Design a protein with these regions (language model features):
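N-terminal acidic, proline/glycine-rich, low-complexity intrinsically disordered segments
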Residues: 1-6
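Alpha-helical transmembrane segments of multi-pass membrane proteins
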Residues: 8-251
């Protein structure tokens, strides 16, 4: 009985791996909402936006609300209330972005916009183009609020990498998943864990690359550097596979 159960578990494990490999091969070679390719592009944009706002807009993070909460606490603790309050509006903008992303999944909205993932990418691209036209005289708060909103819509709309939950514009959760996959791959010798580790490592490296590019381009081109991120999103939208059943994560 024990041997039979072991063989059954091995068979199920192999079947699960084959299903994963099939799905991974499908989403890697076609740019869909769950593909590694799109995940890489979105991670680059996520890193870029945080670097852009931090370098050019008064040291505020657009996508990392954890960072904003930490900075809020630090500055309030030092009695710098005015400095601390600047970190609050991006938090509310982030919440609003989540609400918009959820609203795009409503049947009444999908009838008008049948490909919500493309709608999200186009919305992001247009907003970032507009932000790039704003002169430096525009208050930093307005810029960071706008970018926080856009980033939130992206994060809430694209939440699956192949078949794993992930974050397209932050790195902490992805790093945890990569570490867990590393244990599964190296200690338990699980091939599926190895593939997961490779996928999430690519996402993490892409985020870092986006931050590097965002810093260098912002220092060189100033506020218009954000058009680089807009271009990435526009390219992603144009090549994204038009499949309304898989374009937007619904869970």
């Amino acid at each position: 009985m024990g041997k039979t159960q072991a063989l059954r578990r091995k068979h199920l494990s192999g079947l699960d791996l084959r299903r994963y490999l099939y799905k991974r091969r499908t989403v890697v070679h076609r740019l869909t909402a769950e593909s590694v390719g799109l995940g890489i592009l979105l991670a680059v944009v996520g890193g870029f936006l945080d670097a852009y706002t931090y370098v050019s807009r008064d040291g505020v993070f657009a996508t990392s609300q954890t960072g904003n909460l930490v900075l809020l606490g630090v500055e309030v603790a030092h009695g710098q209330w005015t400095q601390g309050l600047r970190h609050i509006p991006p938090l509310f903008a982030f919440v609003l972005g989540v609400a918009v992303a959820e609203g795009l999944k409503h049947p009444h909205i999908t009838r008008t916009f049948p490909h919500p993932a493309r709608t999200v990418l186009l919305l992001e691209s247009i907003v970032l183009v507009i932000v790039g036209t704003w002169p430096v005289q525009v208050p930093n708060m307005i810029v960071t609020i706008t970018i926080a909103f856009v980033a939130s819509v992206q994060i809430s709309s694209f939440r699956t990498l192949v078949q794993w939950p992930y974050n397209s514009a932050m790195v902490t959760g992805n790093l945890r998943t990569a570490a867990q996959a590393a244990y599964t791959a190296l200690v338990l010798h699980d091939r599926k864990g190895l593939l997961q580790l490779l996928d999430f490592t690519l996402i993490i490296i892409s985020f870092l690359l986006g931050a590097l590019i965002g810093t260098l381009t912002t220092l060189h081109w100033g506020t218009r550097a954000i058009w680089f991120a807009s271009g990435i999103l526009l390219c992603a939208m144009l090549v994204l596979k038009a499949n309304p059943k898989t374009l937007l994560n619904k869970s």
